[in-house]
Amino acid sequence: MVSYSKNVFVPLTRLCRNRCAYCTFRREPEEVRSPYLSPEEVFEIVEKGKEAGCKEVLFTFGERPEERYDEALEWLEEHGYSSTVEYLVDLCRRCVEEYDMLPHSNPGVITKREMRKLRRWNASMGLMMEILSERLCEESGPHEHSPGKRPEERLKVLKYAGELKVPFTTGILIGIGETWEERVKTLEEIQRMHERYGHVQEVIVQNFRTKPGIPMEDHPEPTPADLLRTVATARLILPDVPVQVPPNLNRETGQLALLAGANDWGGVSPVTKDYVNPEAPWPEIEELKRLTEDVGFRLRERLPIYPEYVRRGWYHANISEVVERLSDDEGFAR
C-alpha cells in the first residue's frame, strides 16, 4: 500500500532569515507585494482546497523573517501579532474551526513553547533535517548564510516534537554537496530520535533540483541511481517509518523508488502548485493511482497525521472532532 495526502499549499511568507544556496522560494521585501499573505488571501486558498476535497492545509514559509526584516515585524505588529508563529497559530485555529480542515505546518526552527502552541491546532508538523553537517554551514557551503540550518538547531526541534508527542515529518535533501557518510549519519540521527520517542511519522528523501538564478544553478543534480540507493538505505535504517519520495520531482523514477522501498507520495494538491519547486507540477491523482498500481501497489489517501498516530490518539482535543470526522476506522482518510 502506498499513501498520499490531498492538500492545499499556503505560502504564508516568502521572506526568510536563511539564505540557502539551493532555494528559489525566498524573496527580498522589495520583491513581494506584502510581507505576508493576509487572512483573506489565506482563506481564499483554503476555501478552494475544501471545494476540491482537500483535507490538509499545508503551511510552508520562510523562517522567522521578523528577525531579519523590519517590514515583516511591522506587518505583524500592525495586524496584532508579535511573531510569525503567533499569526500561524491563529490561522490554523480558523482552518479547524471554520473549514473542518487539518493544518500541517512547516514553521522552521521554533522553540518548544511555540511548538506547544502550534500543537493545539495542527494535526502534524514538519522540519527537514536537510543534511546534518557543520561542514555545509562553513564558507561557500549551501548553508553558510542560514543560521536555522545548524545541525544542533534542527535536532533540537526534532527532539521537542518527540517530547510533545507531535506526529512529525522530517527528511533529507540530497545532492547539495554532502558526502554519502553525512547522508547516512543524518538518517541514523533521525532513527535514533524515533527510537527514543516514536514520533517520526515519515521521512522524505528529496532530491536537489537546479533552478535558474540560484547560487547553485550549475551544481549537478543527483542521478536516479543515487536517489534510489538513498531510498533503499533509508528503508534499511528506518524499517518502521514510511519513506516518501515527491512524485513531482521524480516523474521518471517514482515507480522505481516504490520498488526501492518508498511507500508514500506525500502531499499532492489539485489546487495549488509546489511553490518550493514551481517548475515541477503535481501529477493528477488518477495518474498517481496508475503509477502506483502498475508496479503492484494500492494507492490510499491519508490525512496529514498518519494512520498509526490517529489510532494512537496523538492529537490535541481541539482538533479531535475534525480528525475523527475525516478518518476511517483504520486512521486513513474517509
From Swiss-Prot:
Residues binding [4Fe-4S] cluster: C16, C20, C23
Pathway the protein acts in: Cofactor biosynthesis; coenzyme F0 biosynthesis
GO biological process: sulfur compound biosynthetic process; water-soluble vitamin biosynthetic process
InterPro entries xref list: Aldolase_TIM, BATS_dom, CofG_family, Elp3/MiaA/NifB-like_rSAM, F420, rSAM
Cofactors: [4Fe-4S] cluster
Function: Catalyzes the radical-mediated synthesis of 7,8-didemethyl-8-hydroxy-5-deazariboflavin from 5-amino-5-(4-hydroxybenzyl)-6-(D-ribitylimino)-5,6-dihydrouracil.
Stated name of the protein: 7,8-didemethyl-8-hydroxy-5-deazariboflavin synthase
Encoding gene per record: cofG
